[in-house]
Every structure is written in structure tokens, then in C-alpha cells.
């Protein structure tokens, strides 16, 4: 049987898995035995070039990898003179078909079809797994049919049944990880992937946080031919969760395109502690966005409804451009108003569905941004920049100063929305504000009103 896997035109990594066991080599199959028919096969490069079956380049850098589930590390394939075994997952840099010019790093990508001829896999398939608590394992679809990865994990032993990690080649420059929450079919960044693993596709799964031995067995009953169409994105029980998706966008060909993102789901059944319901972040090749909770980077953070003391710090790494923007998706959300806090510029922007916030990359980008929350009862205007409150944090009994205006109305509220009386005096180019009652330790909300703007600042005592 000859199987075919269509690959759209883009120079990017793909997570692939043959559904046949071959009696011929990788070279004779995916490399078309060095054939040069348009739209068929691809170049595969590696150490010592043609000696090991690879296509020769000036550097012979590897483009085909396997993942050692035992050690948890990528390993370059050392030869394409070996045969395929159905269900073996690979990471392959697909440049295009075999007419691509290997002498340049920027050839025009072309679509292609990867073919493999052999015996179809039937019966059970049990991959070797990473047995470390919380360890990741690379698993391929062994069948020439869609597989419901949710039912696979539900039947597994000591595996995290709520999350799976795809590689989406359409994201960013070379592709990026998409984290799929299997309990509600939400992804950290908008993507067409769903719970149905396509023929020829591979994914990462995660072991539960336990030392007990895990096992996964993919069976014929996990095939899902009727429901396996790719490109379907569904959300089940949408009213059960408040959703906040943070998308990082870059300007490509004069269009803003989402290249990375993270997702927060809000429900009082969740916790602000990191639990098995959260999805940890896998490292990307290019830009990387995650929420940070308890020193853990999360692609999907499942948290209870926030209070005014709640924060979702954003970690931002591997920036390749100068200019970006945040784009937000907010749905079914009820609770304290979310704001994007820029710690570098000391600005707050209310997060609404579809809102965008441009920014320029700096060396402080890694922990520059966070999501904070303010009481809905205050009916706050958007935060604006230009005023600075200090000291912040402050000690109980201290005054604070508002720099940037000497003619403003200053009011203070506690987190319950109760007014705190204050005395306000002009001190040079600042206002000295002194509460007239003893304050308890906690969060207070300072409102500064001028003729042209209103600013709300969180003050910590």
C-alpha cells in the first residue's frame, strides 16, 4: 500500500508519523530515491550527506529528528538508509519538493506530497513513554485513519488526560506549539487542530505528576473515521468557562498575524495553584508567550474567578522583531475587569474582546507585562499614562505622592469599593496624599481626576 501525505507550501517543521512499515528505506520513500518530480518528496539532510542517504548541502545540518522518550531529548536521525516503522514519530524540516534549491536558505517554498509504500499497521500499538513525573512523550498515529487522542488518553494509565501538544506549521516563521485542552477543546492560540489525530501526524502527550509507571495503548477502537476531518474547531460547554486568550501578533506583509499566544480559563472549580488542569508550556523555536504561576510557565492557565489581588504575569521570550502588538479574545467572562499592565511604561489598558495594544520590544520584555484586575463596581475609565504614584508599595501610615499633576482630585477606595478619606496638599510638582484613617495592609485603588483624564492606580500598603 502506498500512502500519501500532502504538505502545503511553507518552509517549516512538521510532526510526521508513517502509517506503514516499509521494506525499503526512508530515502526511497520520502526522498523519492533522489527523484526530481515536481510536487513529490522532499530533501532530507544530515551528517556525512550522501554517505548516509542524505541530500548533500554545504553544511549537512540535520533536518530529520526523532525524540528519545526515555531521555526526553531530540536526536538527529543518523541515516535515511533505514526503513520506516509505522507509528514512529519524526520532526522534519520540509523545505518543499525536491526541486528546491538547497544552496540558498531562502528558496521559494513549494507544496509537495510525501509517499511511503509498505504494510499498513493493524492491531494495538504501545509506544515507549517518558516515565518521569510530568514527562513529555512524542507519539505518532500508527494508522491510516484519524485517531481520537482523547479516548486514547482516557484509556491510558497514569497519563495527563486533559492536554495534548500539537505542532502547527502555520504559526510564526517555522511553526509553533499549540496546546489543546481536551476537556473543552480550547487552544492556547487559535488553531485548526482538534482531538482527532490525522493519519501521518504526531503529537506530544504528558505523563501525570506521579512516579507510577504510565502506559498508552492505541487500539483499533480509537479510530474515528467519521469525525476525523481536520480543520474543525469546536468549543464544548462554552458557558462553563470565562475565556481570555492573549495573542502575540507581528506585522508580516503589512498584515498583523498571530504568531503565539496563551490562554486563561476562569471557573470557580479551578485554583490559582498549578494543578493537573493547567497545561505547561513547551519551548518554541521562535517567539514564546506563557502565563507564569508559581514559577511554572503555562500555555493554558485554569484559574478561579479573579479578585483585585490576582495577577497573571506574562513571560515573553525569543523576540525577533522590533514591533509587536497584543490582541485579546475575551468571552463568557464575568468578574473583575482585566487590564494589561505594562510595568515598563506604568500604563494600564482595559482588556476587551478584540482589543489590541502595540508595543516595541525591549531587553525587559521577558517579564514586562501582566494581567491585573480591578473591581467592576468602580466603572473605571481606561488607564492612561503620565501620572506616577510613589512610594508603592508603602508602609501603613505613610503618605503617598502623585507626580505629574498639581491640580487633580484624588480619591481612594478599598477593594470593597468603600471610600477612604484623605488630605491632599500640593508639594512642588506633586500632590501629597495622606489617609486620615489607619489603613490595614492590602490593596487600595487610587483615582486621580484632572480636567482631561482619569487614571486609576493600584496602591499596595
Regions found by a protein language model. Give the residues of each.
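Compositionally biased Ser/Thr/Gly- and acidic/asparagine-rich
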Residues: 10, 70-431, 440-441, 456
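C-terminal tail/sorting-segment detector
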Residues: 439-461
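Serine/threonine-rich, low-complexity intrinsically disordered segments
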Residues: 44-47, 386, 449, 456
Amino acid at each position: 500500500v502506498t500512502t500519501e501525505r500532502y504538505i502545503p507550501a511553507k518552509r517549516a517543521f512538521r510532526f510526521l508519523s508513517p502509517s506503514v512499515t516499509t521494506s525499503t528505506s526512508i530515502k526511497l520513500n520520502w526522498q523519492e530515491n533522489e527523484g526530481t518530480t515536481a510536487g513529490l518528496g522532499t530533501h532530507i539532510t544530515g551528517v556525512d550527506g550522501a554517505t548516509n542517504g542524505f541530500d548533500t548541502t554545504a553544511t549537512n545540518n540535520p533536518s530529520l529528528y526523532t525524540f528519545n522518550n526515555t531521555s526526553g531529548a531530540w536526536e538527529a536521525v543518523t541515516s535515511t538508509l533505514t526503513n520506516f516503522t509505522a507509528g514512529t514519530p519524526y520532526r522534519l524540516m520540509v523545505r518543499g519538493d525536491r526541486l528546491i534549491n538547497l544552496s540558498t536558505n531562502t528558496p521559494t517554498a513549494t507544496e509537495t506530497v510525501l509517499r511511503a509504500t509498505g504494510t499498513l499497521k493493524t492491531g494495538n500499538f504501545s509506544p515507549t513513554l517518558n516515565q518521569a513525573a510530568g514527562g513529555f512523550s512524542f507519539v505518532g498515529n500508527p494508522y491510516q485513519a484519524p485517531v481520537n487522542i482523547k479516548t486514547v488518553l482516557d484509556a491510558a494509565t497514569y497519563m495527563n488526560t486533559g492536554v495534548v501538544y500539537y505542532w502547527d506549521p502555520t504559526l510564526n516563521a517555522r511553526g509553533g506549539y499549540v496546546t489543546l485542552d481536551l476537556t473543552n477543546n480550547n487552544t492556547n492560540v487559535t488553531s485548526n487542530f482538534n482531538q482527532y489525530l490525522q493519519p501521518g501526524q504526531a503529537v506530544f502527550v504528558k505523563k501525570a505528576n506521579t512516579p507510577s509507571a504510565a502506559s498508552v495503548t492505541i487500539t483499533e477502537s480509537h479510530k474515528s473515521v467519521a469525525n476525523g476531518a481536520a480543520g474543525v474547531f469546536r468549543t464544548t460547554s462554552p458557558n462553563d468557562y470565562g475565556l481570555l486568550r492573549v495573542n502575540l501578533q507581528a506585522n508580516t506583509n503589512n498584515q498583523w498575524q498571530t504568531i503565539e499566544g496563551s490562554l486563561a480559563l476562569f471557573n470557580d472549580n479551578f485554583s490559582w495553584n498549578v494543578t493537573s488542569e493547567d497545561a505547561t508550556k513547551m519551548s518554541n523555536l521562535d517567539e514564546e508567550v506563557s502565563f507564569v504561576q508559581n514559577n511554572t510557565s503555562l500555555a493554558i492557565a485554569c484559574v478561579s474567578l479573579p479578585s483585585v489581588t490576582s495577577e497573571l504575569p506574562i513571560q515573553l521570550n525569543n523576540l525577533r522583531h522590533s514591533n509587536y502588538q497584543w490582541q485579546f479574545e475575551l468571552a463568557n467572562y464575568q468578574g473583575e475587569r482585566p487590564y494589561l499592565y505594562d510595568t515598563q511604561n506604568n500604563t494600564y489598558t482595559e482588556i476587551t474582546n478584540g482589543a489590541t495594544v502595540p508595543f516595541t520590544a525591549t531587553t525587559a520584555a521577558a517579564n514586562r507585562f501582566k494581567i491585573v484586575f480591578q473591581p467592576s463596581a468602580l466603572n473605571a475609565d481606561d488607564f492612561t499614562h503620565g501620572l506616577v504614584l510613589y512610594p508603592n508599595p508603602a508602609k501603613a501610615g505613610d503618605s503617598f505622592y502623585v507626580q505629574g499633576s498639581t491640580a487633580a482630585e484624588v480619591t481612594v477606595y478599598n477593594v470593597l469599593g468603600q471610600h477612604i478619606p484623605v488630605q491632599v496638599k500640593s508639594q512642588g510638582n506633586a500632590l501629597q496624599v495622606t489617609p486620615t484613617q489607619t489603613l490595614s495592609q492590602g490593596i487600595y485603588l487610587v483615582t486621580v481626576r484632572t480636567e482631561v483624564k482619569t487614571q486609576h492606580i493600584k496602591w499596595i500598603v
